[in-house]
Amino acid sequence: MKWTDDDNFMRGAVPMTKAEVRILTVAALELVPGQRFLDIGAGTGSISVAAAASGCTVDACECHPEALGLIVENAKAFDVSIDILAGKAPDVLSETAYDRIFIGGSKGRLDDILGYCHGHLTSGGIVCGNFVTPANAVRFREFLKARGYLWTFRYIAVSREDRFGMLRAENGVFMVKGQKP
């Protein structure tokens, strides 16, 4: 089963990083087997599954009860191991150091999460966040700039053909990436 295909994931009512954005996110994270990976606001676990399938040791943080169940189901379906941290970040996060961190949701606690990420990301490590609001994307970029990270800021817009042959736009996503000095 491929993690690049949305139809392979259990979703329910939980938002999921769509295939095109997931592929670009995984590329931006530059995953290497053996790395420690943290997924904050893991949702359905689609990014966690991709990281685990790439050979990373994965911790997925999520507070929504339905999403927690979907992460378990998706990990099982893809035959990967994901350690689940149930609750809000950064409250339930450990003192573990991570090589790669993905922020998929912040529940209004972006500043606290960014502080945690900065303190627990290894030197040379990559943190990447996908945001639907420009305000959070800009806050993340400014955080990275102020701390000397190498950073990129992108807006990703995807359209898909519908059954009538017309292109229908998906919601756009701001992708911000930083590499710690």
Q: How should these model regions be labeled?
A:
Residues 108-116:
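A short, conserved alpha-helix within the catalytic core of class I
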